[in-house]
Amino acid sequence: MDEALQARQFTLDDRDALLAFLGRVYANDPRRSDREFWEWHYLKNPYTDSNNLPIWIALHGEKVVGHLAAIEAEIKVGDETHKTIWILDLIIDENYRRRGIAKRLVGLAEDFRPIRLGINTHEQKSPELLEACGWKIVASIPRYTRVLFPGNAFISGSGPKAFVRNAANALYSFRRQGVANLRPSDGEIRRIERFDEAADRLWARSSATRNCIAVRRSEFLNWQYFEQPNKKFNVLGLFSDDQLRGYVVLYFRAADEQGVIEKAAISDIFFDDETTADDLINAAVELAIEKRVGRVVTDLLNKAAEDALLSNGFFKTKSPLLLMVKSGVAENIVLDPNEWFVTRGDSDTTIFETPNLYI
């Protein structure tokens, strides 16, 4: 890195300068530099220590010209739990690129935790940089889609387009038949308005069968799905004798001017067995049909959950998402894609989706 440049860990005294930088480099995405969103994202995370944030900045004088930001999490690897970071954002001012800044910031981040995680695409150029720093591509995370109302999914607009859209939806009705009549094989689907001790008991009980998975305790889940500014998630739980056996988190895009919801995403799912997974996916599809959503998508790496998607009419599509890892512990587990349980909620895919609430 050039001698005129400095790279170091961020402190809260740098906040205004960093937000100004984010406003410049993400001029078309003002949410990135929104103070409320930034503070929720990096300061209100239950794992966060505000005096030791996993954010690193590059400076030219007092001007921020690059930054790497991560969020803290915990990951269960085998029988042990480790602190980790998910790298969410790495960007350099276009006038300061090719000066070694990105590599220096990655190096600082790697010293922070023994396990470092990221989800990237080749379009971002980050995979090549991270591989040069010793990171490994563990897997391409599969993407699954189910089309419910093709007109709503692919045809927007009013007038003649609305007629074509409605016709396409009607022609596809046979593909939706039967979903609403199915019920959980053992238990009851309920709305969850807040995660509580039931979710913690589910995690304690069911995490034992997963070898490589981000910890899903109620405090972190509430931060992510019920406290995020300007977003509403729908959470469905399967209960049996008042015991939570699994949950699924859905995110519906805001409706357009014609009241059409083009897409919904399954942001997260966690369950105790394959039957529960199947019941939760079916409940998610049923809710999407009620809202006349064009299509439901998800990115997910776990055989049992993927099998449940396939049995509920989802099909695999091309995915650009790459799970990348650099670990100083348990490489035999964390570098094996068959050991992982990963959903959209584990990466920035959910965090950076367009808000569906407007104030």
Language model: regions and residue ranges:
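Extended, charge-rich helix/loop segments that form flexible
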Residues: 158-202
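Short loop segments at secondary-structure junctions
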Residues: 61-63, 95-96, 152, 241-242, ...
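Core nucleotidyl-transferase/polymerase catalytic module
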Residues: 36, 47-71, 76, 85-89, ...
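Active-site/acyl-donor-binding loops of N-acyltransferases
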Residues: 2, 116-176, 224, 234, ...
